[in-house]
Regions:
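Acidic, Ser/Thr-rich peripheral helices and adjacent loops at domain boundaries
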Residues: 104-119
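Hydrophobic alpha-helical segments with strong N-terminal bias
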Residues: 8-10, 32, 55, 118, ...
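Basic, amphipathic alpha-helical segments enriched in Lys/Arg and hydrophobic/aromatic residues
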Residues: 123-186
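Short alpha-helix boundary/capping motifs
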Residues: 80, 111, 172-173
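Exposed alpha-helical structural elements
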Residues: 51, 113-114, 137, 165
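Polybasic low-complexity intrinsically disordered regions
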Residues: 1-89, 93-95, 100-102, 106-107, ...
Length: 186
């Protein structure tokens, strides 16, 4: 999300400004209902993997999480442990230069087995087999959020968080109203 950004024309004519600031939006969705269930707005110097625990903690502990689909930026021991702590299945592709982990935790052993499988079968086949394509639902939802505006009007960080939460509430309501309700009658 752009914050205190500048227009394309100004950037082309005068060059980029060096004090540009960005906010990163991290979301978690329910793949069945397509509702945004977890949201975190951070500054541009916070990595994706640092907020995974906060995102999962926004979902009540008594609600079951089946699987967590993420990109390779989340291929860390900490992220896999956070997912395992919620008794969920981690669907995270190993990084391109991934090496086996030496510890004997179950999440590390599972990741090492995944690494062997990807090397043996190939990344494309693993993505089809694992259902990794479901991660694109989040990318689609991010696109929908940006359709409501890719810039933040608020100046203070707290107000920006409120602005994002308002957009997400509107988008969740749109999603609820726009989803078809299918019933099969015998």
């Amino acid at each position: 999300m752009k914050f205190l950004g500048e227009g394309e024309w100004k950037r082309k004519k005068h060059g980029p400004e060096y004090r540009r600031q960005w906010r990163k939006l991290h979301i978690g969705i329910d793949a069945k209902t397509l509702q945004i269930r977890a949201i975190q707005l951070t500054t541009n110097n916070v990595s994706d993997s640092q907020v995974l625990g906060d995102l999962l903690n926004q979902i009540p502990q008594d609600e079951r999480i089946d699987s967590v689909y993420t990109d390779g930026a989340y291929d860390t021991k900490q992220c896999r442990q956070v997912i395992a702590d919620r008794q969920a299945h981690a669907v995270i592709p190993p990084r391109k230069n991934a090496k086996p982990w030496k510890d004997t935790k179950s999440s590390s052993l599972e990741r090492n087995e995944l690494l062997r499988t990807v090397k043996r079968l190939g990344r494309t086949l693993w993505k089809k087999w694992s259902g990794y394509h479901r991660r694109s639902l989040v990318e689609t939802k991010m696109h929908c959020i940006k359709l409501l505006g890719d810039k933040l009007s608020a100046r203070s960080f707290g107000s920006q968080v409120n602005e994002i939460h308002a957009r997400v509430a509107v988008l969740n309501r749109f999603t609820e109203l726009g989803r078809p309700l299918t019933q099969v009658t015998p």
